[in-house]
Amino acid sequence: MPQQTQTQVETSTSSSSLSQTQTEQQSGPSPPQDQQVQGVLRLRPDSATDTKNKNKSKKKKPKVRWTEDVVDNEHMNKKKTKICCIFHPQRSFDDEMAEHNHEHDHGHCDSSDSDSSSDLSSDESEEENGNKLPSNGRGSDKDKLYKPNSYEYQPHYENKSRVQL
């Protein structure tokens, strides 16, 4: 009895796929069941699919590039944008004296007339400038400017990092 062998060949192109079936007739005795030849299926990716997968795996994440004037965090090669410690730059004695004199020469008087309309308008203008007054109810404290301590003050940094795509 002739044996029929069926072979299936698939051809794939980038726009469509083609399937072809071939049937062969063989005459002669068939090999026993344990000696039948088994085919090996080898799958190969389409060249267009292969390049897409390579591009996805090699896609670079954006990296931050620091400029030369960014300060190293405590000399440990860790340049960070977070606030980790408070830095007070050293000043010369002349600068400290000039600032000290400036703080006490604002023209404020120590009068107890804190309920007048002129004091109210000066308080509003000080709050607009970012200097908030303490609200503890004492009249003499209203004449002093409130300065936040180092932990309350948020510095205004200029973004010096560069993102490389």
UniProtKB/Swiss-Prot annotation:
Record bears the keyword Nucleus: yes
Entry GO CC: nucleus; protein phosphatase type 1 complex
Molecular function per GO: protein phosphatase 1 binding; protein phosphatase activator activity; protein serine/threonine phosphatase inhibitor activity
GO biological process: glycogen metabolic process; intracellular monoatomic ion homeostasis; mitotic spindle assembly checkpoint signaling; regulation of protein localization to nucleus
Composition bias type Basic residues, residue spans: 54-64
Bias (Low complexity): 1-40
InterPro entries, A to Z: PPI_Ypi1
Comp. bias (Basic and acidic residues): 43-53, 65-76, 96-111, 155-165
Name by which UniProt lists this protein: Type 1 phosphatases regulator YPI1
